[in-house]
Amino acid sequence: MDIVAHIQGDPGSSLTPLILIHAISGLALPYFALRPLSTDSDDGDSDKSRPVYGLSSPIFESVSAFRRHGKSLPSLALEYVRIIRREIQPRGPYLLGGWSMGGMLAIEMAAIFVAQGETVKHVVMIDSLNPEVYPPFQDSQEHQVLSTIMYNAIAWRVEGLEEACMPTLSDDASTTTSSDNSRASTDHGADSEVESEADLDDFMQQLREHVHQGMRMLASYHTLHRHIYLPDTAVTLIKCTMLGNLSPLLRASRKVFAKKNLLDPHNGWRTEQFRSFRSVPFASTHDACFDAEASEELTTILRGVLKDID
């Protein structure tokens, strides 16, 4: 899987590319669910079709590279700044965004770009929490439980997200073995089937590790005593207004935090951190942002945010 994916738009357009960072799954694939984000892209003028790129985690190319750079949100963000300069856009101004942890990483990356003398026009966060307020784990068991809950929530969606890139994935991929995922209806031979199943097992293991390490990065962020200030960057938070089902395995304090955050239109961010900060309500649960029933509204909101940005 390539780290950088061209999602939509004309790479030759004069409009600033929108670079979307993966969520805790490490996958940029959900962004392919978005409709065209350029409102004038259908009039035949390719220059008005903003290029949109998605950034996936390096874990799917090199586990060792992820382990080297994925020790904290700032260290991972620094590696992503290097990747963007090398493979997408060597110089600013930049336009960044991301869903959930992707928005947190986008803010970290914006701070790094600015420290390097670049301009970051805007950061668009899709229901991203300020990691400063994320509660630390009480113990290793809570880390494991939360990581498993998160992994399972992602794994059952993987079939729809990965169908263009991966062999068939079972809906219950988090619990089946490779033998359970046999593709009896394919035209490939047995060797190909075994190889595909091995690739799938590796992929799901990488996904599990990424979620586990991502949760650790969030829960330990407070220990960095990091407070980002971007006085020249505008920020939009697309805020989910619906609370999904809370797992009975969650501790009571986690459930209280989730309910409290739902009522906070800023998701813990402080408006004085940025040149401007706008919160736009989005009628979706956090996990369903890119599901079919929500992606059209999300596209409309993103179009509105982007329409006045060159």
UniProtKB/Swiss-Prot annotation:
**Where would you find the membrane-spanning parts of this chain?**
14-34, 95-115
Q: Where is the composition biased (Low complexity)?
A: 170-184
Membrane topology recorded in Swiss-Prot or TrEMBL? Multi-pass membrane protein
Q: Check the record and name the Pfam families matching this protein.
A: Thioesterase (PF00975)
Q: In which pathway does it act?
A: Secondary metabolite biosynthesis
GO MF terms listed in the record are: hydrolase activity
Q: What is its EC number?
A: 3.1.-.-
Q: GO terms for CC?
A: membrane
What SUPFAM superfamilies does its record include?
alpha/beta-Hydrolases (SSF53474)
Disruption-associated phenotype? Impairs the production of pyranterreones.
* Protein keywords: Hydrolase, Membrane, Transmembrane, Transmembrane helix
Q: What drives induction of this protein's expression?
A: Expression is positively regulated by the cluster-specific transcription factor pytR.
GO biological process entries:
biosynthetic process
- Highest rank taxon of the organism: Eukaryota
Q: What does this protein do?
A: Thioesterase; part of the gene cluster that mediates the biosynthesis of pyranterreones, a family of antioxidative compounds. The first step of pyranonigrins biosynthesis is performed by the hybrid PKS-NRPS synthetase pytA that condenses 4 malonyl-CoA units ato the acetyl starter unit by the modular PKS of pytA. The acyl chain is then connected to an L-serine through the amide bond by the modular NRPS of pytA. A tetramic acid is formed and released from the PKS-NRPS pytA to give pyranterreone 5 with the help of the thioesterase pytI.
Record family assignment: Belongs to the AMT4 thioesterase family.
The protein, known as? Thioesterase pytI
Tell me what gene encodes this.
pytI
